[in-house]
Amino acid sequence: MNFQNKIAALRAHHEELLNRINVPNAWGNGIYEKYVYPILTAEHTPLEWRYDFSEKDNPYLMQRIMINATLNSGAMKWNGKYLLVVRVEGADRKSFFAVAESPNGVDNFRFWDEPITMPEAPLLSPEGEIFGTDDATNIYDMRLTVHEDGWIYGLFCAERHDDSQADDLSAATATCGIARTKDLKTWERLPDLKAKCQQRNVVLHPEFVDGKYALYTRPQDGFIETGSGGGIGWALIDDITHAEVKEERIINSRRYHTIMEVKNGEGPHPIKTRHGWLHLAHGVRGCASGLRYVLYMYMTALDAPTRVIAQPGGYFLVPEGKEYIGDVMNVAFANGWIADDIVDGVAIDESRVLIYYASSDTRMHVATSTVARLVDYCMNTPEDGFYTRKSVETIKTLVAKNKGLKV
């Protein structure tokens, strides 16, 4: 096969993957439907990102730049299209952001021509003046928020080496990077979030609260370990262009022998419904094989986004089947979801909800539900009783109820 024929065969194979129709799994749990195929893998990335198509310079048609994974994607519906800002990880371990677009949200995702060029973070003097920039070694896990101030915000983790531990090449620090855009192509980088501790899991609430920007935070002592950090926090910010956490309180706590014993964090920004705010979060616990990441849900009051009104016990979504396998095993993580039908800022009960999650830090998937089903799940699923005895009592109550039904 000559060089041009090899390219033609490569393009045909790639198009077959991009055009593959996705279908729901035959059986589910009634809460949501998972789909048969991942929506994005490393192989979905454009061939032009990976191959040099010059026969002179690349006679063997080798991949010159290899892509390792597509994961942890922010999501939004824009101009009738379903857009993901994907964390793409190269073989060199560096992550970057790229937009992938779908006409229906469940398949036919295609990346835009080029990755996002994210500007460096401005450095501020004590007087608040910009005096330079600081380039992070790695950036990843963007949460997208279309804010009522008219901007699209992307909040993400900015990782740098911890120079206070010069001899430890694995020592790192995490800060919250902040950028905003009008078109997802040109981004304005704002100064990183200023906080008293490390912040790698921060989400912007879509509305002003008491005239201020509101953040869901995750205070932690180290890059990985939460230490004294108690869970999902809440902070109000006066000026997003000079964002600083001055006061912070925990609104969703970690607890012993639960799915969020080690740490927990907000996923995407919550969805506003007439019943309250729907929240999707991740919880982490330790087990024999390492850290297990799962997704869980909770709801807060419509007039008080910090007041929890419902929280089902246990996990909402976990890795299953082939989802267990990947770079970091036994992980489900989500930082993007989309409610299809929004009226006056509120997702209607009949609205489809697309939940975008990554499995094992390797590939992207979608699960679909509706606002009505997710609200029902949150409001009517038993809470965690925190003791085996309570769990057994809950099951026996349901058994007794079902015995009295003619089904």
Regions found by a protein language model. Give the residues of each.
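Beta-rich carbohydrate-recognition and catalytic domains
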Residues: M1-N72, M76-T137, T145-V203, E207-V262, ...
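Donor nucleotide-activated moiety binding/catalytic core segment of transferases
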Residues: I259-G267, N330-F333
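C-terminal structured domain segments
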Residues: A334-I342
